[in-house]
Amino acid sequence: MTQEKKKFDAEVGKILNLMIHSLYSNKEIFMRELISNASDACDKLRYLSQSNSELIAGDSNFKIIVKVDKDNGQIIIRDNGIGMNKEDLIENLGTIARSGTANFLKNLSGDSKKDNMLIGQFGVGFYSSFMVADKVTVTSRKAGESKVHTWESDGLGEYIVADSEQEFTRGTEIVLYIKKSETTFLDHFRLKHIVKSYSDHIAVPIYFCDEAGNNEIQLNSASALWTRPKSEITEDQYKEFYKSLSYAVDDPWVTLHNKNEGAIEFTNLLFIPSSKTFDLFHPDRKKRVKLYIKRVFISDENIDLIPSYLRFLRGVVDSEDLPLNISRESLQHNNVLEKIKNAITKRVLGELRKKKEELPEEYNKFWTNFGGALKEGLCEATTDHEKLLEVCIFRSALHNKMISIDEYIANFKEGQNTIYYLSGDNPDKLLSSPQIEGLLNKNIDVLLFTDTVDDFWVNVNSEYKGYAIKSATRSDIDVEQTTSQPKDKNTDSKKSDNEYKLLTDYFKEILGELVKEVKISKKLTLSPACLAVSDTAMDIRMERFLIEQKQIANASAKNLELNPKNKIIEKIFNDLKANNKNNNELVNLIFDQACILEGEPVADTGAFSKRLNDILQKAIL
């Protein structure tokens, strides 16, 4: 038997060291790489046999066999694919980053490229074996040839290639001599789990057998559901796949199975769960959409395949156009990935828009489960905010049901050009807020925002389809003129301020720095007073949230708006006109009440309690 000792290409030692110790963060993917290579070999031969059937004569059923020899510390992977001769072994295994598959693809043209599930884009996958093995031997016989050759290396810079006299059928056998520190990979259960996790949908059947080569058990389903036509898949099959993929107990609410053809080709099989996922808002949450390339699992981590706000999606995306980086664990940032992401996002939002219109009750349940996550996209600079807002729904204060902003606009009062909202923690409390009593009295609807994220997205989305989005806590809202045309607006606001200057000055004198300004309200109809902020100030709830998060130290002074039609305010005003200024405690109590209704802390709870007791005593006596 003749043999040759050769050195790897220049710098190969450094590259091997980098790859073994740094490039792969998950050692178990060595199995994925070797099985992928075996699958490539079978696909190559299947393609070539179309024009030369003699190549597979007597052995036309392609398969991959995995064995474990615990006594000798070996893992063996065997395929009956195209095999390699001596020159192939030197070219494909003796040179880092040279891929026989890549060269093979260059020789294909037309539709044959689509028909070959060839996944090796780089020549380093094989060398991931050295993460777990201190020696690797390869025995191979090329289809159509009679000679057998071996390749052997410890990964330290040299390899031996030799002729072999042993009897060997077509294909390749790889033997890994497992390191003592990695013997857990010799465990049958673990190895089976690895194969099923990464290679379940490889088209070539993968068998596991005992040391003697008996008792073959097929490990993979060898059938990627997403590659089959939708017309051939039943609803139960979709449900079964969803549950096995995501370990879910619920049924999917929506199934999206699409094949994208054109400049970029990919297939997606995506599911929207019917139940809320437990880790939706967990900081360590994992993405549940798996990336496959030609039916081989690549990753569900460190890939920007779907936007974060669609993280409730479950499923797979399979593409032939995605380039991989040299480790195949993380994708290069490129336009292809971005286009796939945009296409998926557009498809999902389109389906949600359809469900919102056709199945409003079911959509309400979906929104309860995932609306909070979906609205996070409104805070992202790269999101099409208008398209995303089209699928958002909010509780209507006027109708006490969930509606979209488009429905809100369709029900505008004549002359109305503003979308009003009020944010808070509890929708029932918001309904009784003095901030919206005047608007509701005029049949002007108000959207109730109850998620924390609402206070953030409205800061970057001040309008929708040309209509301003405004908080009902703003000081400049006039319910009498909010539906008037600009030409009809008059000077009532200034007249009211001047008329009640005695009243507002008195309140400001008593409250001092506790308030920024005291104004006559144009939106209150029943309550005596409320807090408000100017258009340029931070919303009250947003400020409170930032204080809780210690992002700002103290609350800013708010405006106090007074309702001159309220009996209490009217009495104070009449007393002032009679030169009676003995309502200081009542003024403070009105302010304290406004703070409480807005969820703001009372400046002095002891003084508040005393004032309340004094007024109650006077009322009794």
Curated annotation (Swiss-Prot):
Subcellular location: Cytoplasm
Disulfide bonds: none
Pfam families: HATPase_c_3, HSP90
Keyword presence, Nucleotide-binding: yes
InterPro entries: HATPase_C_sf, Heat_shock_protein_90_CS, HSP90_C, Hsp90_fam, Hsp90_N, Ribosomal_Su5_D2-typ_SF
Annotated segments matching region C: 545-621
Presence of keyword Amino-acid biosynthesis: no
Protein's UniProt name: Chaperone protein HtpG
Organism: Rickettsia prowazekii (strain Madrid E)
Gene name of the encoded protein: htpG
